Amino acid sequence: MLVAVLLIAGSGAVPSAVAAGAYEAASASTTVTYCSDGGQAQTLDMYEPLGGAALHPLLLVVHGGYWSVGDSAVSQQSQFTQAVMSGAVAAGFAVASINYRLAPANRWPAQIIDTRCAVRYLRATATRWHIDPHEFAALGDSAGGQLVSLDALSAQREQQWDSAQYAGQSTALQAVVDCWGIVDLTAPGWSRLGRGLSTNAFRVPLGSPSAVLRSASPVSHVGPGAPPFLIIHGLSDTLVPPRQSTELRTLLRAAGDAATLVEVANAGHGLATTAVPMVPALSDLAGQTVSWLLATLR
């Protein structure tokens, strides 16, 4: 049952920081089409907290997979993302996890077009989902981190990435959780695997001096007025170099924007761990993330 999966998957329990929340269960509406750019219907899974009359803040979840693989299903998310999703619903958030067009069948910028269209769809249908259109947060990991960060930093600019659907709605986000995101696509130091996978979407490998990669890099769009960022990265990540997150934090702060970086010891890509426990522990980090979202939006 989807309700049970959302509430217990990953960490085995709602993170302690939000265990006492007013919302103890969720209803799930699956296979909801949000956009159909390029003639391809894209769906999202919406999880709504039960109880309470107030409008809910929204957490948009965008999966990773080097723009080529992945799925909106809870079971396909990292253990950390699953824990944040369950904690967010327990804390009163509506959570929307999206699919988007994947490479190589769909080249860039299909992925950012779909992500931005999802934000606009959710604002257009805010009444249906009982969500506050002024309290939109997004969490993405790896390529998903690139997508949510790029949307947040380009906001109403870069209209070439806008679908014709829901054209009157804003793509703005009020908070971003960037988890080990790919934020500087032109930087050196990528693994052979990463360079190879990226060609599926961009036709050129990461690290190339390409105008397309530069435009797709969130760091190219940093400026004053960005929403608050919580950036999380495992220090043992060999697929996305941790300095990607350090660079983003530095640039955001230099522009006068709020940015917090959490560097997780003994954790690789996706916060994968070995025999040595990660620090902070996953359940603690998930609870802290939900608390940050609450403090930032409320």
Predicted regions, residues:
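Short beta-strand/loop motif that positions the catalytic acidic residue
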Residues: G225, I231-H233, D237
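Conserved alpha/beta-hydrolase "acid-adjacent" motif
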Residues: T238-E247
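Short substrate-entry loop that stabilizes the transition state in hydrolases
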Residues: G52-H56, G65-R107
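Catalytic active-site module of serine/aspartate enzymes centered on a nucleophile-bearing elbow/loop
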Residues: M278-R298
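N-terminal cap/lid segment of alpha/beta-hydrolase-fold proteins
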Residues: G21-A54
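Primarily recognizes the serine-hydrolase "nucleophile elbow" in alpha/beta-hydrolase
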Residues: R120-W190
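Mobile cap/lid helix-loop segments that gate and shape the active-site cleft of serine hydrolases
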Residues: D37, L153-A155, G181, L185-H221, ...
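Alpha/beta-hydrolase active-site loop
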Residues: N106-A126
